[in-house]
């Protein structure tokens, strides 16, 4: 499964985006994430809509990738900005097609929550 959304972001560059996208900030940026149980910069544990999960944070050339390494669907979320464009991309993938409608809806809500969070950082 793959979802891609874009958010207008004329006031946010890659450096500020990377600084905002920390594990500790996840509950503030995405309402589907309830709290951070542990944060060790590049890895941590969160409690979210899908329960407790280990999360990894990887710095990319133009953004950040969060992955859920123990998730049975290998969910990843990349949030990137091309400084030549005034848009932030929110890209979510799983390692297989998802047929469970409730899970699909929860992923769609996860992305909607990220859009809201990114918009608050941009303004």
Task: Show where each model-derived region lies.
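Hydrophobic-ligand-binding modules of eukaryotic lipid transfer/binding families
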Residues: 1-6, 89, 99-102
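N-terminal secretory/membrane-targeting helices
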Residues: 86-91, 121
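Short, highly charged low-complexity linear segments
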Residues: 8-12, 47, 78-84, 109, ...
